[in-house]
């Protein structure tokens, strides 16, 4: 490829980047795009850098309108690529509704255990089930599977959190039910099964029953007459047995090829108080029984559950056959592995909070909905990403970068721009006149207004330590939207004012964000990878609860303003 052709390609990619982001791109971004589309140029990467620097220097002297005009002239298709929203959304496959009776509504449910706030994984279930309900003008139910007061003990606050966060995600439930409020219903159905001879009270030792089950042999209680089983059941309800002395089993096929299917437990005794019902009940249904009951009585027509729960339907269908019920249509989806967060369960997160490892459920290190909300992730972005995943049994590796990219589409047009200087270092500028720097609040929307920053003569400017550490005498820094400085000393850091000519960018001058020593506000940014302390422009105090972009740093959400501004890291 001729040098001239390469330069035109670089110019196209650089102009597109500048037009999209409203600022001169980093050389690496342009080079990466070039080498990604033309891998044959990779052996010549070093030779290309001077061409890239020259093109970027030229673009640095152009206004946004000039950038758009030039891009329209040499590569109008790249303008169109940015302006047309591509529909890459896979969306959700249609549901099978052939089994619905006349007038029957599509009804779906999300069934969380309220032992903590919803995580990003829970959000998938909320969003997909809600979306299907809306697609078919159906019903979306939030049902709390809270019948395990010992191992997965519910949190009272979590009931409210789930409903509130579902509403924030744009997925308000049509009905909210807690299984712990409906134990009399489960007892009634258990007694029907006992009368039918399809359930029995077992008082075998756990190890004894396990050995019998593995051998495909019935326990001595399996053929107990229904009347005697009912007496034992009533004894269970009355507290006549200790914690592990009795269970109610569903009679299935004791010789089933899968031992897990053989006479599984429907109810067990739990003496630990329940956060909602206290000590009112001590005989609690297992999830497979409770869920089977609720799906029937709530009129659930379609269930979406993890493929790791495929056996659940086989277990529950015994009950449905015994009671003459029709089982809902079931779809399964694969696991989602959340890259960048490691393995987080609600119990692990709770232990970490109690140990002081995390600030709370909204700690940015955690993949909870409330943490993402506090960081400035938009509910629309979460919805789009989850719906795009679709419903497939294939396991998915989900990178947070995917969510960040979706969120960036939403916040980038809205977020005002400001300077934030992490780990500030003083740069003494000699020979500089009094100057008023003027920078747009948004590079692509000048109607929004400008930030004006007054800078005294011979000022002390604060710049990031990372830039200060790399500055050497003779280097030229372009203080963004202010002027140019030639470094004269490193310890302390000093420089001479050398005007405002943007042509210094052709010489490789580095663009640096800055704040005056007098015109900034102490700012702390909390992110998933740690904290950043520095100084930001004073005007960010007008952005409470808004997402803004700290130029050359990241998007952040301004959380609190109390002397020091506290911001939460959103994403790059």
From Swiss-Prot:
The listed locations are: Cytoplasm
Catalysed reaction(s) here are: tRNA(Glu) + L-glutamate + ATP = L-glutamyl-tRNA(Glu) + AMP + diphosphate
Taken from the UniProt entry, a GO cellular component term is: cytosol
Keywords, A to Z, come to:
Aminoacyl-tRNA synthetase, ATP-binding, Cytoplasm, Ligase, Nucleotide-binding, Protein biosynthesis
Q: Please state the protein's primary subcellular location.
A: cytoplasm
Where would I look for the motif 'HIGH' region in this sequence? Answer: 112-122
Query: According to the UniProt entry, what is the EC number of this protein?
Result: 6.1.1.17
As recorded in UniProt, coiled-coil segments are none
For the protein in the UniProt heading, the enzyme class is ligase
Q: Which GO biological process categories is it annotated with?
A: amide biosynthetic process; glutamyl-tRNA aminoacylation
Name the Gene Ontology molecular function terms of this record.
ATP binding; glutamate-tRNA ligase activity
Give the similarity note. Answer: Belongs to the class-I aminoacyl-tRNA synthetase family. Glutamate--tRNA ligase type 2 subfamily.
Family annotation (NCBIfam families): gltX_arch, PRK04156.1
Q: Its function? A: Catalyzes the attachment of glutamate to tRNA(Glu) in a two-step reaction: glutamate is first activated by ATP to form Glu-AMP and then transferred to the acceptor end of tRNA(Glu).
State the name under which the record lists this protein. Answer: Glutamate--tRNA ligase
Organism in which the protein naturally occurs: Methanocella arvoryzae (strain DSM 22066 / NBRC 105507 / MRE50)
What is the name of the gene encoding this protein? gltX
